[in-house]
Amino acid sequence: MALENYNKSRKNKNILARLSRYKFDIIFIIFYLFLIYQYYYHISLLYVPIHDGAYYLLNAHDWLTNKPLDEFYRPPLISWIIAGIWSITGESWVIVKGLQAIFTISAGIILYVLLRKHKGAMFAFSVTALTMVSGPLFFFSTQIGTEGLALFFVVLTLYFLKNQKASHWFLAGMTIGLTFASRYPIILQPLVIFIVESLITKKPKLVIRTILGMLLVILTVVIMVYLKAGTFQTALAKDTAFTLLFSPYYLINSLDIWGLAFLLVPIALLHERTYRDKFNYAFIAWFIVSLLFWSANSSNFQVRFTIQYTPAVYFLSVLAIENIIKDGITINNTILFWYNSINSYIKSFKDKYKYNILGHWEK
């Protein structure tokens, strides 16, 4: 009897230990079930597609029926997927109105799995939950469009590049190309991640594999669109004007877009602990380059342009909290870190180059 009670007690302790170990995974699953229900509820209320969604549906019809594209400058991937579904089910926008939500939900799962492996379950859940409940992301993911689709391939690219397997880097190249096919200008974001990871790994063979995979997909997309439309255009002319005078639009509206969490981003960028872990570098570059790119547009500023780099914003926000908890905020150490970093860069530059009497730098 005593032995049975001991075994039961031990078994109960093991169950509790497992529940404690996987508590954030359980919370994540519960959160995701709630999220899926919210998507289902809001999508079921839609009676007509938004303007952009209507044209993606028209383009899908044109691809399916071999007619000229209504708007040939729109990225083709979402229309190809819809056309593929319609070839089986018949044409009905109701069948595909929840399509983008599937990609957004999948992006969150991939993000959680990646961050859980490298940063822990609590960190992963925090970043993923903040990303998934982001207002712009949720709203546009309930529509027929490309925001969630492009986010999915950006996150999937990040996932593949964080692995050192050659096959994963080739797949990363393909997902970069699919990001291009999803939403043309968003290709910049996985490219930035790719460049950062390439500099960290320093493995030319992996880089070449990624480039080959990327070119394979991009050339296929360009050729197919060109053969269909007789031309290839990535955007309207009015949306392609850029300037070095960066607009403050996204910074001014940052609290409306990302909430109070955005206030933590500068802390993460300035804190020296952020730069100890090379895993963070891709997220830093992802955020900075994306923000500067969209701020450099001379006229077209939209909240939905921030969706694809929202994970980077919340990653840095949560990282700032982690830095404060573990190291605190020490202004002197932060200033010293940046002072030493700048001095180190200047010294390495001076060692590499010499200034000749003619006023030119030379090696």
Model-derived regions: residue spans:
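Short acidic/glycine- and proline-prone juxtamembrane loop motifs at membrane-interface regions
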Residues: P136-E147, Q302
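Loop-to-helix entry region of an early transmembrane alpha helix in multi-pass inner-membrane enzymes
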Residues: P76-W80, G90-S106, F140, V303
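Extracytoplasmic catalytic/substrate-binding loops of multi-pass membrane glycan-assembly enzymes
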Residues: S44-L57, L69-I81, E91-V94, F232
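Transmembrane-helix motifs of polytopic, lipid-linked glycan transferases
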Residues: G98-H118, L156
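Membrane-lumen/periplasm interface segments of specific transmembrane helices
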Residues: Y37-Q38, Y55, L206-A268, V289-F293, ...
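Perimembrane helix-loop-helix junctions
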Residues: R10, N163, L188-L215, A241-F242, ...
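Hydrophobic, aromatic-rich transmembrane alpha-helices
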Residues: F194-S198, D256-N280, I284-I288, N333
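Transmembrane alpha-helix segments characteristic
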Residues: D25, I29-L33, T131, I176, ...
